[in-house]
Amino acid sequence: MPNGVADSSANNDTVGVTLNGGLTGTFAIPADYATLNEARDDLVLKGVCGDVVFNIATGTYTEQVDFPAIEGVSEDATITFQSASGNTNDVLIQHQTSGSGDSYVIKFSGADWITFQDVRVMNTATYFYGNVISIGGASDNVTIDNCWLKGNSYQTTSYWSANILMQGTNHGFS
């Protein structure tokens, strides 16, 4: 109802829709996307329509990344984040967590068919909450390949201080 009254002429009504094509191909961080979070945001916005590879340039990336479900992913349309050089020592993704709600550097909360390869991931927290990777939310087929993981330095056997924390079942983790 325009202006709170019945529409006298429905023939002139319009609707606008913006459609985004799914991502496919190889992209560079930070050339095409400044951060891993920026790449994740575009994945969530556009989805994928083929294999997507993000080559991460040598450097340190201080950020925390949460991957929800992404439209279009499958065994034939996967997502890979990898060191551009192929050298694990060249890329460091780090974050300092501060509580149970953010106890991760990389989190998969519904993401499927996603791989991290040849990178270092470190939680720089110095107290209790030090998970590095958290997998949950019905995430499936998550692969961590040739990665170096380091949790916080606090000595505990707590649930909140694991290099890889998996919640739920049947994740297809490798």
Where are these regions (language model features)?
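Loop/turn elements at helix/coil->beta-strand transitions in domains of secreted/extracellular proteins
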Residues: 49-52, 77, 117, 140
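Acidic Gly/Asp/Thr-rich repetitive segments characteristic of extracellular carbohydrate-active
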Residues: 23-62, 66
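Extracellular/luminal regions of secreted and cell-surface proteins that mediate adhesion/ECM remodeling
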Residues: 1-22
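Acidic glycine-/aspartate-rich tracts in secreted/extracellular proteins
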Residues: 2-5, 32, 45-47, 58-62, ...
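Right-handed parallel beta-helix/beta-spiral solenoid domain characteristic of secreted/periplasmic
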Residues: 64, 72-128, 151-159
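Solenoidal tandem-repeat scaffolds enriched in leucines and small polar residues
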Residues: 151-174
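All-beta strand scaffolds that present successive hydrophobic residues in beta-strands
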Residues: 56, 81, 114-116, 139-144, ...
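Extracellular beta-strand solenoids
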Residues: 29, 45, 63, 67, ...
